[in-house]
């Protein structure tokens, strides 16, 4: 079988992986050995195939072994900054939830700088987080035991005697939810420990009282992370796959729906058919015609019509609103957020976007001009009016048990105003002075984009 990783950032530097879904892999779902400054966030790694015939392990041990591993993670190596792993969901994986791969620097000293926070881990088997790194922040994570879980330690920092220097960790704010639903907070010897091997002598302090480095993302409590990660994780735009929705619901409710055919372990499939196989996935194939993006700049025509840019002229590297993000980046950010293209009133079932909240109370946290919004029994009704902009953002807040989450909902309204005005070409030379984008006065303009009195004007 194919024993490659599902996805990875091995050796990467200054890189981010965001909102990905990885499942049914052999070896492990994700690997970033040797990575430097990088981030993995809002990604779901689930159902790594367990007793699946991992070729290398068979060659080394002469037998098939359980190898349903989530991730081996590097970061902050070779003088770089830090590897950041936050707001991810790891579910139904036997081991490596996570496996720390700090490595050694060029002089043989322990390397690696890891910041692991606000992750949710459910139904691991015999291994949660283990391995070694020079400096580790392990904080505000939520580990929920499942029917396959046999390892109680959330963190085993392993000092293996292969290098020089120290390996230490800051541990704080983590929760282990027991199989009976009770919660256990950080306690050395109960939820975390260190291990010595290969003659390693511990002549340093293995635990730090404070984080080694700043976390460059908002750090929530473990309780908040549990609800908020389950509400927004994985490849969930434009729609969430039924597989991912199932895994989220099982994590929320503490259930499983699969059994490994060889191991008999609940929730840990040995092959994809244990989980229904590829035929069970609700994947719909679609194709686009050539008119979807006429100028081939990566921005579809429908979005260019909404923003008032010219779909016949590539503008992917332009910055129409002067915010230092290109027009292409603006489009990608818009479609990466829940979005709706409408011409009339519509409704949204908020349960689909706040899956981590069982009994949430909802409120409108921000409503743009020209849009009316109301919520009843978890159903959001949105009504655009003629004064609405072509692009606007509505904000909805969910609250439950002292925890809250605010999510954006982008609304495209073709009947609204883009703020860019079309004027007939024949009338252009009779009005106020017109300037091109190099701020040169134009008296006989050709079709294109111009400036008049500080506003953009399109002449067609």
Language-model-detected regions and their locations in the chain:
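Residue-level detector of functionally pivotal "anchor" positions at catalytic/ligand-binding pockets or at interdomain
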Residues: 338-342, 414-438
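Extracellular/luminal low-complexity segments enriched in Ser/Thr/Pro
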Residues: 379-393
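Surface-exposed or secretory-pathway low-complexity segments enriched in glycine-proline
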Residues: 344-348, 352-379, 407-410
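Extracellular calcium-associated, cysteine-rich motifs in secreted modular proteins
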Residues: 275-342
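Right-handed parallel beta-helix
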Residues: 1, 11-24, 36-100, 110-125, ...
